[in-house]
Amino acid sequence: MKTSSLSRVLIAAIAFALPSLPAAASVPPPAPAPSATFNVGSLRVQQYGDGQRALIFIPGLACGPWEWSGQIAHFASRYTIYAVTLPGFDGQPPISGPLFATATADFWKLLDEKHITKPVVIGHSLGGTMGFMLATQHPGRLGGVISLDGLPIYPGSAFLTPKKVKAMATATALRLASLTPAQFAAEEKTQILPYLITAQSDVNAIAPLVAKSDPAASGKWLEEDMLLDLRPELPKANVPILLIAPYDASVDARFGASTIGAKQAFYAGLVKGAPNLRIVMIDHSRHFAMYDQPQAVSAAIAGFLAQAL
């Protein structure tokens, strides 16, 4: 997968950073009411179900557990589910200091405090990237990692020099920090989500939820995400990993993936250091494949769980 200009990389980076849905998508059913809600350090945690094995859902940039509501509803009868909200997102207060380092440290505190043994981490986008990070930190404490379109390196960054990545990340953070909440909400609804979600009904449903996140915190998270490159650490991630990768020819072909196989090959190159990783492609879906193809996403998760647990 090649790109001919920085502008294409920037557009691709935005596409990977925020939610997207296909024309026929519909908002997933709501999750059941959580049995408990509590905080562990910087994390807000909602608990569902009482199964023997645990799943921990991590939403993506500027999102909350609402994006996983369909999967939470699907799996809550068989597993104990912990759905976390990262600081600065979905109404949670922002924090100072390093974000990924703080959130992952609090993740391990969650396991300690609730005596959670070998959970499967299921993350979307930035949450999937965090799943890769957790797998490199303490793989023996995890039962597996499922990442929905989250990678060990920000896709746009893979095409750029470190200097350009730094400049782009800093500029992105500063611009988002300059927005008022009203400007952030308007930009999401009118400039970002319409390019990433083809059904206007989905734009209307998701935009006010994304707008609950803090603009400056979203920029800071995005800056850290863009500067990450976990690829050298992947050999440490000796735990089963499933990468669920969406494909939509009408979008991906514009960024060099003219076929679903081309996108799979591109992704495979970015995760090739992981010793126990499998990629599942989901056609006719975009970044938010759990909205586009909910049954296919749930089936991929269920198949992985049947083997990993």
Residue ranges and their predicted role:
Residues 2-55, 76-79, 117, 152, ...:
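Alpha/beta-hydrolase fold catalytic core
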Residues 29, 48, 82-122, 126:
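Active-site loop/oxyanion-hole signature of alpha/beta-hydrolase fold enzymes
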Residues 41-93:
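Conserved HGGG/HGGXW glycine-rich cap/lid loop of the alpha/beta-hydrolase fold
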Residues 117-159:
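Conserved hydrolase catalytic core segment
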Residues 145-179:
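Flexible "cap/lid" loop of the alpha/beta hydrolase fold
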Residues 157-163, 177-236:
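Conserved alpha/beta-hydrolase catalytic His-Asp/Glu region
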Residues 241-285:
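Conserved loop-alpha-helix segment in the C-terminal half of the alpha/beta-hydrolase fold
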Residues 282-294:
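Catalytic histidine-centered segment of alpha/beta-hydrolase-like enzymes
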